[in-house]
């Protein structure tokens, strides 16, 4: 078994032992028993997982507290997405959130010609030059984590003379029932705000203002 498989199995066992906040009091000996490894090997894996940012570790009178980070959870959800792809299982992801103001960055990025050409070719739309920003409700964060694990529709990044624009993945969705696309960087950014694009100005189309609740339905 290679190291990456050991890391995945260890995070899975920590998750199984954890509470709803992804925290578990686990000694290296107990984790060793769960993994069928030596105590020394389990201790090394815990140290490695912490160094790689998959978990955080604190020691108190109660013992060693292991907390799975967003990066660690992503490892689990990516495996879920891969199995879903192999088994041809479609995931219906429903998230709720509220409309929040943007910083103008969406318009800047969406208006790049290299992106627009790909949106037209791969998504079949020329998008309105701006994004609808939705702050995902805490109750929907597990669904957002699940979505991050899927590959979506690949939008290639590119370079200009003065900067690099990263690759993006897009997912067909419905925003309050209106066909649209949820986009996110392929390089994971841990945020609870998602961006929606459409060929329509969604704020006008859906009569939305900041603070209004929105439901996003994605088929991944």
From Swiss-Prot:
Its cofactor is Mg(2+). Residues 1-92 are annotated as: H-T-H motif-like. One of its GO terms (biological process) is riboflavin biosynthetic process. One of its GO terms (molecular function) is riboflavin kinase activity. Mg(2+) binds at residues 131, 133. Binds 1 Mg(2+) ion per subunit. It catalyses: riboflavin + CTP = CDP + FMN + H(+). Keywords: Flavoprotein, FMN, Kinase, Magnesium, Metal-binding, Nucleotide-binding, Transferase. FMN binds at residues 188, 195. Residues 93-220 are annotated as: Riboflavin kinase. Pathway: Cofactor biosynthesis; FMN biosynthesis; FMN from riboflavin (CTP route): step 1/1. The keyword Lipid metabolism does not apply. Its EC number is 2.7.1.161. CDP binds at residues 102-107, 200-203. It holds the Pfam family MarR_2. The keyword Nucleotide-binding applies. Catalyzes the CTP-dependent phosphorylation of riboflavin (vitamin B2) to form flavin mononucleotide (FMN). NCBIfam families: PRK14165.1. Belongs to the archaeal riboflavin kinase family. This is Riboflavin kinase.
């Amino acid at each position: 078994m290679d190291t990456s498989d050991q890391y995945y199995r260890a995070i899975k066992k920590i998750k199984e032992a954890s509470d709803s906040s992804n925290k578990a009091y686990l000694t290296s000996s107990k984790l060793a028993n769960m993994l069928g490894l030596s105590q020394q090997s389990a201790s090394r894996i815990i140290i490695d997982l912490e160094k790689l940012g998959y978990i955080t570790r604190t020691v108190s009178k109660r013992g060693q507290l292991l907390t799975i980070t967003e990066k660690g959870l992503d490892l689990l959800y990516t495996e879920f997405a891969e199995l879903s792809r192999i088994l041809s299982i479609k995931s219906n992801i429903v998230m709720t959130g509220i409309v929040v103001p943007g910083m103008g960055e969406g318009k800047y990025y969406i208006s790049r010609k290299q992106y627009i050409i790909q949106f037209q070719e791969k998504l079949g739309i020329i998008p309105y030059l701006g994004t609808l920003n939705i702050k995902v409700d805490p109750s929907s964060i597990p669904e957002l984590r699940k979505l991050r694990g899927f590959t979506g529709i690949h939008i290639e990044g590119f370079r200009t003379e003065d900067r690099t624009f990263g690759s993006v993945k897009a997912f067909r969705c419905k925003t309050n029932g209106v066909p649209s696309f949820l986009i996110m960087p392929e390089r994971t950014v841990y945020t609870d705000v998602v961006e929606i694009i459409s060929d329509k100005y969604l704020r006008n189309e859906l009569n939305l203002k900041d603070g209004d609740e929105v439901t996003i339905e994605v088929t991944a």
